[in-house]
Curated annotation (Swiss-Prot):
InterPro entries: dGTPase, dGTPase-like, dNTPase_2, HD/PDEase_dom, HD_domain, PHydrolase_assoc_dom. It comes from Haemophilus influenzae (strain PittEE). PANTHER family: DEOXYGUANOSINETRIPHOSPHATE TRIPHOSPHOHYDROLASE-LIKE PROTEIN 2, DEOXYNUCLEOSIDE TRIPHOSPHATE TRIPHOSPHOHYDROLASE. This is Deoxyguanosinetriphosphate triphosphohydrolase-like protein. One of its GO terms (molecular function) is dGTPase activity. PROSITE patterns: HD (PS51831). Residues 72-285 form the HD domain. Belongs to the dGTPase family. Type 2 subfamily.
Amino acid sequence: MQKNEIKQSDMKPLIIDSSWTERFLPDPPREKDNRPPFRRDRGRILHSAAFRCLQAKTQIHAIGENDFYRTRLTHSLEVAQIGSSLVAQLKFLETFESLSQTLNIDKNELQKQLKPLLPSNDLIESLCFAHDIGHPPFGHGGETALNYMMAEQGGFEGNAQTFRILTKLEPYTENAGMNLTRRTLLGVVKYPALLDVASPQYAELNFSRNIDPRFVRIHDWIPGKGIFRDDLKMFNWLLENLSENDRTLFGKFKKVRENPAESLHTRFKSLDCSIMELADDIAYGVHDLEDAIVTGVVNPHQWQAAHSALKQIPSAWLQENIDSISQRLFSDKHFERKQAIGALVNFFITNVRWKLTANFDEPLLRYNAELSPEVIVALGVFKKFVWDYVIRNVDTQRIEYKGQRMLTEMFQIFESDPERLLPRNTANRWRNAPEERKKRIICDYIAGMSDAHALRVYQQL
């Protein structure tokens, strides 16, 4: 966005509409329950079965069986801690400097105006606790398997499943999931578009679905990002108080699809979501690297290219510290590695700043958190290293491929005789669902499994 697109005269007074604390179903506090709305949301997520299940979902599949490595549960706890630190950092005057130059408004005035917009600790922790609960067993392999099986019924994607769990599946209410506040749900939605629109248009492609599940190519069935069409009612409710301009702008894609194999990604997210996503990226780039180093998945020789790339970034802190950081990352002394990890996390957190997204009417959409340009590049180096040497590690890929096979075969088995093989409650839901939604019931059941549970069920079958 050009600096002259939004001028000081365009700045609208900061108003946080009370509708953001509304819930889909009336839900008055219990007697003598004086907790604010977002603390109640935090409690519901923390005590949910979907959150507990994260303890049995591995963050990195190639690092072996020991007590050190992170699960998706410990990852989510670390994301919450980083998220709270980012919120605290965004209250300081220096984080408004770039936005002040963009809008030609005094940064003290911006600080006074925008600080009340920041999420509370309860809210940001709610988002960070919830952000991974829709991810299926066996990582990308599991996601691909379910997307392959659901390609003709709207597809499957982990973020979409998170929204579905929060708004429908988690049995806090009969049909509205956890019945969370509107602002909490807005903060969880990373991609505000329908998945079947954002995903590759499989009907126009020549990908065969009549093949042995052992030979499904993962790259042919990587899903897009969005919300299931089955959950459109709750998505519409979430956005119903936005202006028509905001709803249209919020769902815009970054580009126009040029061929049917392309996935589309939306351009915008809420302020709260941008903070949560930064926290997730920092945890992924730094803490997952720590796991890989400790367990021997990566070595100093492999790190050299990343080290050289970081040396080229015009950051005074990196120029001064990256040699020492790299040495301590691979030190035999655990405390030195922990100090290096802590220094990196602090570097990313303290370089967060406010940014203007677009001329939204809603302040929660008008502003986001971001890292400064050189720090974005640095985080990208860390994320790429984890992707290249950890996620794409052959051991990781073999485990995910095995999971992909298991989930695809389980889906086919359940679909062949669901009333016999599905658990009673799931079978009842399948029986009562309209024909076009029966496969979604099977998908929900499999997606909710942990890695170990999926393996046990597969062995039983």
